[in-house]
Amino acid sequence: MVKIVKRIKKIREGINFNELYTLTDAVSMVKERAVAKFDETIEISMNLGVDPRHADQMVRGVAHLPNGTGKNIRVAVFARGDKAEEAKAAGADIVGAEDLFETVNGGTINFDRCIATPDMMPLVGRLGKVLGPRSLMPNPKVGTVTTDIAGAVKASKGGAVEFRVEKAGIVHAGVGKASFGAEQLIENIKTFVSAVIKAKPQGAKSEYIKRVAVSSTMGIGIKVDLVTIRSE
């Protein structure tokens, strides 16, 4: 307990929690404080001026991070025939149809992204109660229901990050690892923020982005000045 308190105190040192830091400074501070024995994930959290209980204020999309996430993404694909072979050739970890349905329906989910061809959706749709709560249900709006299976698999493996606003109006995602260079993280963060801005719904309030913060897995949030994300 004493060690934990000391670690938290050390992480908080030098941070003014009332200040908005430039993106460059915030990334530097987060990296300096990511001292765990594993490669911590660098995360972004955005408070949005939306109420997702209203359909016209839902925020959902996908950001294609130029430098990847640093995570080995396991991809499952629901497809048959040539499309199943296309998925395997593109590097999908799990490919199947009715057999994969039975596996998932039985509670075995050992993948991070789920892709399906349009003809498979009547079957996959029956897995809504299993995949939905885990944000794994394929959706054409984020490119996971598609005939371009190879492209979708490669995008998922290469840094595609899905996002969806939560009940409190918060969007968050991992945008890299502490081992990434500062410029790599900055590029990824800018790309993610741009994707969220592009996903602004018609019903959003005038102040769409209220707060942006970055942190590491074991660290604390450092608030970022949105202007510097757009200008640096």
UniProtKB/Swiss-Prot annotation:
Gene (UniProt): rplA
Function (record text): Binds directly to 23S rRNA. The L1 stalk is quite mobile in the ribosome, and is involved in E site tRNA release.
One of the record's GO cellular component terms: cytosolic large ribosomal subunit
GO MF annotation list: rRNA binding; structural constituent of ribosome; tRNA binding
Natural source organism: Bartonella bacilliformis (strain ATCC 35685 / KC583 / Herrer 020/F12,63)
Organism superkingdom: Bacteria
Protein name, per record: Large ribosomal subunit protein uL1
Assembly notes: Part of the 50S ribosomal subunit.
Similarity annotation: Belongs to the universal ribosomal protein uL1 family.
Keywords: Repressor, Ribonucleoprotein, Ribosomal protein, RNA-binding, rRNA-binding, Translation regulation, tRNA-binding
An example Gene Ontology biological process: translation
NCBIfam families: rplA_bact
InterPro entries (alphabetical): Ribosom_uL1_bac-type (IPR005878), Ribosomal_uL1 (IPR002143), Ribosomal_uL1-like (IPR023674), Ribosomal_uL1/biogenesis (IPR028364), Ribosomal_uL1_3-a/b-sand (IPR016095)
Transmembrane regions listed in the UniProt entry: none
